Amino acid sequence: MAFLLRVVPRLQGPTAWRRPLQGLWCCSGQGDSKRWVGSRSPHSREKSPGTETETFHTIYRFRAIRAIGFLSRLKLAQTAVTVVALPPGFYCYSQGLMTLSSLCLLGGVASFALAMLCWMSHFFRRLVGILYVNESGTLLRVAHLTFWGWRQDTYCAVSDMIPLSESQERVQDVFVRIQQYSGKQTFYLTLRYGRILDRERFAQVFGTLATLKNSK
């Protein structure tokens, strides 16, 4: 995963990802700097009351989330093709057109693909693409991926977020967990490959990075 994070930003030229990922993140203005576009890019939200009128400021962005969303959907399609090939495999085996070892190999590949899909989706659904904070600094909006590789926004109270200074996480690590006191959600962000756009508002939610680096 760390290798992917190093390679993806280098491959992202001005047109490298624009066409195949046209339904992903795109600019839309200051309050909501990223949104979904295109008819094939559903955008779901776990809304909190009153969020429609809130103004949000972007405090963190992980640009490689576009490539990871594409990879998630590609893996989903590959797994579907592998699983769909099982019934024809059983038919060919029953007709004597396939050996038992070939059928077992096909079943093993399908099982491995399913296991990898579950593992990757478990992580990708918790990987943070963008973080927003409202004007009053009381509500955190987390943009992450769904199982299908599309964007989903989750709203969390800032007062429920555990500061990194109170957790056991090391900010120097590739991935850092951000958790809630209520234990409802756990997300992962990468301070090494992501970009903090508003350090002041970020520090209000997660603590000052200089203090965190010196304390770990």
Curated annotation (Swiss-Prot):
<keyword id="KW-0999">Mitochondrion inner membrane</keyword>
<comment type="subunit">
    <text>Part of the mitochondrial complex I assembly/MCIA complex that comprises at least the core subunits TMEM126B, NDUFAF1, ECSIT and ACAD9 and complement subunits such as COA1 and TMEM186. Interacts with MT-ND3.</text>
</comment>
<feature type="transmembrane region" description="Helical">
    <location>
        <begin position="69"/>
        <end position="91"/>
    </location>
</feature>
<keyword id="KW-0812">Transmembrane</keyword>
<feature type="transmembrane region" description="Helical">
    <location>
        <begin position="104"/>
        <end position="124"/>
    </location>
</feature>
<feature type="topological domain" description="Mitochondrial matrix">
    <location>
        <begin position="125"/>
        <end position="216"/>
    </location>
</feature>
<comment type="function">
    <text>As part of the MCIA complex, required for efficient assembly of the mitochondrial complex I.</text>
</comment>
<protein>
    <recommendedName>
        <fullName>Transmembrane protein 186</fullName>
    </recommendedName>
</protein>
<feature type="topological domain" description="Mitochondrial matrix">
    <location>
        <begin position="1"/>
        <end position="68"/>
    </location>
</feature>
<dbReference type="InterPro" id="IPR026571">
    <property type="entry name" value="Tmem186"/>
</dbReference>
<keyword id="KW-0472">Membrane</keyword>
<dbReference type="GO" id="GO:0032981">
    <property type="term" value="P:mitochondrial respiratory chain complex I assembly"/>
</dbReference>
<comment type="similarity">
    <text>Belongs to the TMEM186 family.</text>
</comment>
<dbReference type="GO" id="GO:0005739">
    <property type="term" value="C:mitochondrion"/>
</dbReference>
<keyword id="KW-1133">Transmembrane helix</keyword>
<keyword id="KW-0496">Mitochondrion</keyword>
<feature type="region of interest" description="Disordered">
    <location>
        <begin position="31"/>
        <end position="52"/>
    </location>
</feature>
<dbReference type="GO" id="GO:0005743">
    <property type="term" value="C:mitochondrial inner membrane"/>
</dbReference>
<feature type="topological domain" description="Mitochondrial intermembrane">
    <location>
        <begin position="92"/>
        <end position="103"/>
    </location>
</feature>
